[in-house]
Amino acid sequence: MTPTRPSVVVSFSEAGWRRFLAADRPRPNLLIVCASVEMEAVVSRVMSLCQGPVHARQLPGELSLPEELTGTLVLWDVAQLTRGQQMFLHDWITVRPPDAQVISVTTAPLLPLVEDGQFLEGLFYRINVVSLVARLGEGRADSQADTRSDMERQHAGSARFRTR
């Protein structure tokens, strides 16, 4: 059976994004799939919108996470994690402190990697997939009409997530 995960569609207006990041405890883990967008711009913008301390890790590289982490951990590019790093992150997310939130950014769709056994299925299901509907890296240029149209298309489509 092919694993599927429905996308959560988010309007990336600053006010909407702040409300989404300030969700009820425990705060959700997020995966932002951003094809055709500069990943650094997305990471920079997400970090500027997060409340509280922000810890950033560029991957691949050493993945060391403090046990007492609070605030937001931003990881990029999560598709490049080694199998050992995936297992470490999965275990950390499972018992993470309630005040910590993990936001991962990638340009590679993870579902094909899960299907090929290159990405840990358990970690994939612990990350909520968020499709990039607006141009987060381009500031306030997103329009409500475009976002509404994208949301309607997403909800009318299949349950598999898509990169945009």
Question: What do these predicted regions represent?
Answer:
Residues 126, 130:
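ABC-type ATPase nucleotide-binding domain
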Residues 2-113, 134-164:
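AAA+ ATPase active-site-proximal loops
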Residues 115-119:
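Charged helix-capping and loop-helix junction motifs
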